[in-house]
Amino acid sequence: MPHYGFTLAEVLVTLGIIGVVSAMTVPALMQNYQRKSYVTQLHKVYNELQQTFLQFKTDRNAINLREAGITSADTLNAMTMQYFKIVESCSDATTVEPCFENPSKYKKLDGGSARAFDNADSGSFVLASGAAIRPWLSGNDNNAFIVYVVDINGRKGPNVFGRDFFDMCVDVNGTVDTCSDKAE
């Protein structure tokens, strides 16, 4: 009588091959997913900032943010509290915790210290989306009228500048852009 089926050795070899292929592809898939998640969260925060400044100017019938009333850290914080969906406010300007992770844990892509919380004249906030923001009024009429330090996923890691942690500059007209070295 003929036997139909696979031997135990054939089944184990097949399962081993499936395991090796899975072990090689799953990390790449997870990394791809994480990157797309960061991009989506960054777009969400960017759009929220852009829409907020447009709404703020429209409500005050102003042509720019200075005319709309943003002239100090206090007015910037008040606008932030009124126009964003804030779930946590860290109003002590001398510390970023608990809205952000400890500043020493923020790094650049090369592993160096990020030093992004040098401004001590504004509070920090956690948005309903989970992003943490810290506005700073530089007062320049160039591309860095307001600088927002943004951690798109709040206190969660990796807390690396350029991955989940960014500076966003807002010009006096309310246009949001990357800062690069414009805030200097």
Regions found by a protein language model. Give the residues of each.
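N-terminal single-pass transmembrane signal-anchor helix
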Residues: 2-34, 41
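Membrane-proximal N-terminal amphipathic helix
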Residues: 31-65, 70-77
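Intrinsically disordered, low-complexity regions enriched in Pro/Ser/Thr/Gly and acidic residues
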Residues: 72-184
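Extended alpha-helical regions
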Residues: 1-2, 9-11, 61, 65, ...
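Aromatic-enriched hydrophobic runs in primary sequence
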Residues: 2, 9-11, 16, 43-47, ...
